[in-house]
Amino acid sequence: VKSAVSRVVAAVSVVVALGGSAACGGSGDDDAGKSAKPTRSAKPHASEGPSKLEKAALTAADVKGYKVEEPDDSAAPPAGKPSRAECGPLAAMLGAGGGAGAGTDTPEKAKSHVGRVLTPADDKGSTTTDVGLSAYAETDAEQAMADLRTALRSKKCAAFRVGEQRYLGVRSLSAPDKGDEAVSYKLAHRRGEYVTRESVTVVRSGSTLAVFGASNLYDPEGVQRDRDAEKDGMDGSGTPTADQDPKVDPRIVDAQLDKV
């Protein structure tokens, strides 16, 4: 098993790699999101009020293979102002999902908000997916999406801080063709000697923003234990390796948008 020092070195190497990839993040990425579509015929949205959002929130019956829970209110998002104001929306959306402090605070300008946390029902998966619904005035919802695109286009947002929390490896991802418009991106942040990696998709449907945040933890010690187990002819625990970024399950996205 690797020593604690080598585990830290391994984690830092992931951070360095993320920082390197961040330099090209946002370049040539129309995938920072899909352009807003022409307004569709009006239909009731979950943004009509808190009770509507609660009814639209996911349950275990909506997505097979997942446990669905309410977020832990004891968690709290990073305190403090972003080091660069234009980068703030990228971190703010992490707090608009269902966990890691998300769901504990209503996003800025949102009228109401609900969050859920989804984990694999068999407890074998390593990815947690936070899902949040936030109701806005439609112009505010559109502006929130525009602010995300601006941040992803800015090279200054490849790495930034919110208080003492440093985010890095920011890069746009291909967004699903869902709702009126969508934006997807990834980033990472240190947690002690480990690295938390997050993939985020934000979909606007009218005045409602649906935020999906998939996350996993890169644990060098766990990876090494898995390798040692394989050498001994045993199964490892499936700890994500350095190149296994989390992914938002399309089934979760579809199930949630069907209820909005």
Annotate each language-model stretch with its function.
Residues 51, 55, 67-205, 251-252:
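A small/polar (G/S/T-enriched), proline-flanked helix-loop surface module common
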Residues 169-260:
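A short, solvent-exposed beta-edge/loop patch
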Residues 11, 18-56, 78-112, 221-247, ...:
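N-terminal low-complexity, Pro/Thr-rich disordered segments
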Residues 11-19, 66, 71, 255-256:
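Compositionally biased, intrinsically disordered low-complexity segments
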Residues 1-12:
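Bacterial N-terminal signal peptides that target proteins for export
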